[in-house]
Amino acid sequence: MIDLHCDTIMQLIDHPHDGDLFSNNWKIDIERLIKGHSRLQDFALFVDLEEQDDSYGRYESMRQLFDSQIQKYSDYISHVRSYDDITVCYENHKVAALLSIEEGGVLGGDLAKLDKAYADGVRLITLTWNYPNELGEPNTGDSHKKLTETGIAFVERMQELGMIVDCSHLNDGGTEQLGDILDVPFIASHSNAREVTARRRNLPDHLIRLIGEKGGVIGLNFAQSFLGTSSISRIDDIVKHGLYIINKGGEDVIALGTDFDGIKPNTEIEDISDMHRLYDAFRGAGLSEEQTEKLFWKNADRLLKEIL
């Protein structure tokens, strides 16, 4: 299993008495990653620009916490910076930990800070969150706006460095533009299908197809508000979105991006160790074993191998 998005580091820094990365009260920890046979977990460093007076300082604090926890539990998990690192984790039966930034605005439009983030081991950036920033417009804003000149420069530099560009939270116009700018795949790390659930945060059909045509992946988001009308995150709704995305973008586009520890905890899938229930549900819905393996890890693994 590869999960392309969680907010566990945010919970650990905000609730230090609720456990650490090895064992905690949230949805993801090392114990449960091992129990769930996880190959790789992306850990997002999320910063709310409107809540933080020093957004870059908040990012640095979260990164330092991530580093210290990975070092403390290095017998079980490793911070990966390249696909070679991922391969070593697989061979040694360790969980691979990918580090990402959720909210490109924390870098303030500064290419030097982007280079430093890369040097510090960040390999994926979600360009926007819910506010306009130096890079572009979020899905909550004008859907037709494009990336800024700074945003274009950032994306081009990310491609040069070998970083994954993430369009989850980005508006439609900016996402369309990524298809023209990039020569490599890009992803929507935690997004669903707008035609299934009419939320602007979800992807319209033409962007599902675009991401698929570029060789990218779309990670299924478990947030109940993006899945349907139920008050809980239901397995049936996740399957419905997954099958729809496969139908529109192909079986090579689908992946997992749970958003665990960043969404409400009312989920039928109890935590990251409970993902076998979703696997069984997709098999029961008609996916072959190979198609389900693609969804659970092979598609994301292919993309990581191509970019990192």
What does each model-identified segment do?
Residues 222, 248-272:
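Short acidic/histidine-rich active-site segments
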Residues 46-47, 262, 297-302:
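A short, acidic, flexible beta-alpha connecting loop/helix-capping segment that sits on the rim
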Residues 24, 232, 236, 269-273:
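Soluble non-cytosolic domains of exported or imported proteins
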Residues 1-220, 225, 239, 243-246, ...:
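Extended, charged catalytic domains and RNA/DNA-binding interfaces, predominantly
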Residues 233, 240, 244, 249, ...:
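C-terminal functional module detector
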Residues 270-308:
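Mid-to-C-terminal alpha-helical segments outside catalytic/metal-binding sites
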Residues 178, 198-200, 230-231, 266-268:
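Short, well-ordered secondary-structure micro-motifs
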